[in-house]
Swiss-Prot record:
RNaseP catalyzes the removal of the 5'-leader sequence from pre-tRNA to produce the mature 5'-terminus. It can also cleave other RNA substrates such as 4.5S RNA. The protein component plays an auxiliary but essential role in vivo by binding to the 5'-leader sequence and broadening the substrate specificity of the ribozyme. One of its GO terms (biological process) is tRNA 5'-leader removal. Consists of a catalytic RNA component (M1 or rnpB) and a protein subunit. This is Ribonuclease P protein component. It comes from Streptococcus equi subsp. equi (strain 4047).
Length: 119
């Protein structure tokens, strides 16, 4: 994901947490806030309770990859994805389905967009 698509500064994270709305499912929480940018900006937070650094980085890579795939269909808002316990056990397809679900609940995806389900 390009740097312009990332929420990096602590000030931005705090603004999203304080002023934004949240939506959650069993594996992920999303806080979102209208931004001034022409595209979405995403921050990813994976706590130490999920495992060691290797495990946490693997979860972040999966989330980042899903967001890159869905990028054309995301609304231009700033949001933070927080991984909950159990997210480290998910494979890529499960991460994609769970993130799609919570993004849809938060109304961050374009109307009518659905991911293709592999059988």
């Amino acid at each position: 994901m390009k740097k312009s698509y990332r929420v990096k500064r602590e000030k931005d994270f705090q603004a999203i947490f304080k002023l934004g709305q949240s939506m959650a499912n069993r594996k992920f929480v999303i806080y979102h806030l209208k931004g001034e940018h022409k595209h979405f900006r995403a921050g990813i937070s994976v706590g130490k309770k999920l495992g060691n650094a290797v495990t946490r980085n693997a979860v972040k890579r999966k989330i980042r990859h899903v967001l890159m795939e869905l990028g054309d269909h995301l609304k231009s808002e700033d949001f933070v994805v927080i991984a909950r316990r159990g997210a480290e056990e998910l494979d890529y397809q499960a991460v994609k389905q769970n993130l799609h679900h919570v993004l849809k609940l938060a109304k961050l995806l374009e109307e009518g967009f659905e991911i293709e389900k592999k059988s």
